């Protein structure tokens, strides 16, 4: 049995252990707003758009969330995950990790979810790929200063968004036509969503899981990850950073 099978078995076992915890959670609201309809059989394709300098937790955090989702009635993973870059050249992320992209922007499968982490400034070709792909996505989400990449497409113009608290001033200066929400863990606008810095991407990914499969599945996913953050259920939970002294 390989490591992935071992993990799946452990997660299935933990679902049983989760039941007592779920009973304790029963008092919490279970309604899901802005729900999304998952495919009956096919996997949901999730593209992680990366380039040099991509911040690891910004894309690996959401990746872990999506890969840990288990639907008891399914044999396979409900999400199909892959990386996309402008070329197949290895990407050197923050901290030096190297990632060889699965696809380029010219041959990537059409995504239903796009994850845009903090990274280097995008080329015109990458900007165009985001704009074109977002016409048919369920969710195009940025994490941290990935909001700058998403804003560069013009898709956020006239909408509200958030980003890493240390970049509030720069974002407001660069994109005055975007309503910056300081103190938001994440912000949703139709098929667009932006998360605050770093770990905020985990919460936004859990929120996407909730929109597809409901709050109980999202809770089980967080439980299996031993993730105790509650921000995915409260988009305004970054108030600590709304007026943080380190903000610029």
Show the residue positions of the predicted features.
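Bacterial N-terminal signal peptides that target proteins for export
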Residues: 2-14
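A short glycine-threonine-serine/GTX helix/turn-capping micro-motif
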Residues: 190-197
